[in-house]
Design a protein with these regions (language model features):
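Basic nucleic-acid-binding alpha-helical/helix-turn surface characteristic of O6-alkylguanine DNA
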Residues: 1-103, 151-161
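Flexible interhelical turns and helix-capping residues at alpha-helix boundaries
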Residues: 86-89, 113, 117, 141
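Regulatory, non-catalytic segments
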Residues: 104-119
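Short Lys/Arg-enriched helix C-cap and helix-to-coil transition segments
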Residues: 120-127
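…primarily DNA-binding HTH/wHTH and HhH modules…
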Residues: 130-161
């Protein structure tokens, strides 16, 4: 699916960038990496959850603690609502806006997904257009979004019923 760069702190994961190449993932982090230590052992539990997810455990990513400090209340609400979408299922931007407490804020819901700091972990790939189209996906493009949805559906076939 691509390369992931993780940035964490005492209050949990601060960022996760999923991009097609390592260089793109690092560049996506930008200045957030300034002053960061390279400590792969700090993410042992996160990596374990990612491996379990890739092996078909649709709830594994729910265990990863996230640090939402500095995030607007609407984005926090939208990200939490997105996290509640079960693996193998999709919801519309309209649904997301309503769940975040602002039913008419579909564009803002789209912006919350576009600015998702936690690629894959907040599963914005599960949010699609009301007409069933994929919408957008900054975590590697629409091809990656489609593959993630197909993988989840294959691992959770009861979601298709």
């Amino acid at each position: 699916m691509g390369w992931m760069v993780l940035l964490g702190g005492e209050d949990g994961l601060k960022r996760a960038s999923l991009k097609p190449t390592p260089q793109e993932a690092i560049e996506d982090m930008g200045m957030d990496l300034d002053g960061a230590d390279d400590d792969p052992d700090a993410f042992t539990e996160v990596v374990e959850c990612l491996h379990r997810y890739a092996a078909g455990d649709g709830t594994a990513l729910d265990e990863i603690g996230l640090d939402f400090s500095g995030i607007t209340p609407f984005f926090s609400a939208a990200w939490n609502a997105c996290r509640s979408i079960p693996a193998g299922e999709t919801r519309s931007y309209a649904w997301l806006a309503a769940e975040a407490g602002s039913p008419l804020a579909m564009r803002a819901a789209g912006q919350a997904m576009a600015r998702n700091r936690f690629s894959l972990i907040i599963p914005c790939h599960r949010v699609i257009a009301s007409d069933g189209g994929l919408g957008g996906y900054g975590g590697g493009g629409l091809g990656v979004k489609a593959r993630l949805l197909q993988m989840e559906l294959r691992e959770n076939p009861e979601s298709a019923e």
